[in-house]
A protein has these predicted regions:
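Short beta-strand-centered aromatic/proline hotspots
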Residues: 37-46
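Short, well-ordered loop/turn sites that connect or cap secondary structure elements
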Residues: 19, 24-25
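Well-ordered beta-strand positions in beta-sheet-rich domains
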Residues: 16-18, 37, 57
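Short, basic/aromatic beta-hairpin or loop at an interaction surface
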Residues: 1-15
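Short, solvent-exposed secondary-structure boundary/capping segments
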Residues: 47-60
Length: 64
């Protein structure tokens, strides 16, 4: 599993999560979270201070 920081933008509101995905998504991918599909807008990498590790950070917008 890949631990990924995700910022979901739904109805103009942003929510931040850390989730385990099967792989690191790339821009344009669709991911399903909480029964809703989101389109990945961008992927960056940042330090997760709690785990002292480099993790991907995804910005995704509600799809459809």
């Amino acid at each position: 599993m890949a631990q990924v920081g995700v910022q979901l933008i739904e109805n103009g509101e942003a929510q931040d999560f850390t989730v385990d995905l099967g792989r690191v998504p790339v821009a344009g991918d669709l991911i399903e979270l909480q029964g809703t599909y989101f389109k990945v807008a961008s992927v960056t990498f940042g330090i997760d201070s709690a785990h002292e590790a480099l993790i991907p950070r995804v910005v995704a917008e509600q799809f459809g």
